[in-house]
């Protein structure tokens, strides 16, 4: 069964290049996190002459045969909030962020709830989230195309990532000539302040 998403990761890469065009930026440092890392890879593949450097964070090459997300995490990810009421949505995302978060850098639940509520109040668009998931699932593997990337590349990945396991970062780095891989002990599929400070 072939899934045709409303938009693809390649479409998102074209949008990113369109933003650079609109800003009259010829070349840029391209950074992407999770799905954004996949889009950043697509940008570097499609327009290598526009990329000063590539940083792919907790992302994947899309190669087949890599370890899958933990099943308990997938169950939480694929579950829907009990209702569209803000409190139910916050409860859902608290469960999700606890499931994918960094075991070495736990976030107090009160802080997590406050941050999630601000995000929900600013913009909650579950159909858009679903479209993004479909775009990821339907994207072809970038594995063979990554060899075309010649820009300096940094691959950053949590060693405790339960959603996109560390092996995905290792695979991405080995496929890009000269790429440097940095793993962070105890970091899951989020961006705790301590590892982020080291990234910067």
What does each model-found stretch correspond to?
Residues 29, 52-55, 147:
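Residue in the alpha/beta-hydrolase core beta-strand immediately N-terminal to the catalytic nucleophile
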Residues 32-36, 40:
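Gly/Ala-rich beta-loop-alpha elbow adjacent to hydrolase catalytic centers
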Residues 149, 155-157, 161:
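Short beta-strand/loop motif that positions the catalytic acidic residue
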Residues 159-164, 189-190:
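Acidic catalytic loop of the alpha/beta-hydrolase fold
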């Amino acid at each position: 069964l072939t899934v045709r998403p409303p938009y693809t990761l390649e479409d998102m890469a074209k949008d990113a290049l369109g933003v650079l065009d609109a800003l009259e930026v010829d070349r840029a440092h391209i950074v992407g996190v999770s799905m954004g890392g996949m889009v950043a890879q697509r940008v570097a593949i499609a327009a290598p002459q526009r990329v000063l450097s590539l940083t792919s964070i907790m992302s994947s090459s899309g190669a087949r045969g890599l370890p899958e997300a933990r099943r308990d995490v997938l169950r939480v990810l694929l579950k829907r909030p009990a209702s569209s009421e803000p409190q139910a949505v916050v409860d859902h995302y608290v469960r999700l962020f606890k499931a994918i978060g960094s075991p070495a850098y736990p976030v107090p639940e009160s802080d997590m709830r406050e941050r999630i509520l601000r995000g929900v109040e600013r913009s909650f668009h579950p159909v858009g989230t679903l479209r993004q998931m479909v775009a990821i699932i339907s994207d072809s593997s970038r594995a063979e195309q990554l060899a075309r990337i010649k820009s300096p590349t940094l691959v950053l990945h949590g060693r405790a990532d339960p959603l996109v396991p560390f092996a995905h970062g290792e695979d991405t780095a080995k496929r890009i000539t000269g790429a440097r891989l940095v793993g962070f002990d105890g970091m899951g599929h989020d961006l705790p302040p301590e590892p982020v400070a080291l990234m910067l």
